[in-house]
């Protein structure tokens, strides 16, 4: 069997090997398919490969990582450079205009904006100094604690479980509208009885998994249950995927009043610390990579 090579392009600061990403348990399955996988970052020496995946855990991919991706002949997610919610949300609310009813406030950034907050700290001169002294994580923890003491509406990052809903736009704190890190959307939640629901579509090439989470909270974090969905993802969602240029990722959405509402898109989906809980999804998705190795 001809050995083929696949490069996962990360950002050095992502510490890929220390995190729990859905892509990681696929690597041994690809090895069985004759595909060797290497991990590369913008700080490493160039490693040649037949194809690559742009797997940078930031909302907006830095230029250095884009330059690395340009050196490969085929790049999965190569066009997915900016996944701020303002780039895809159809539910955005402005401060003026017709009353939208209940609203929901969250960050424009992916995963609450924590990665961007960390990057801003570590790229500052105190951050570079503390990194040289091996104290960078200490500095980040101190800054995060100080940030959490700020008024909620003025923060640069927010735990996703702390996103807030308001009965009307008039109740949204004035500071929210001045904070470029936050967005206000119409509160469009899929419901089943008293539970809030979120559907998850994860895919790699033509392979996919579809499920739905039920939760007691609108942020859908304290899970009541996760169940597979037999029905395929809606065609409308597939068109969004095509428009955004995703080859691999996860979309969170709901069906509200018969209409699709896209909540979030993610090009670096994670896993729980127990990889066995995702074994079925990994086995289903991994063969999708073969489309880039004809």
What spans do the regions from the language model cover?
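Phosphate-binding site of ATP-dependent enzymes
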Residues: 134-240
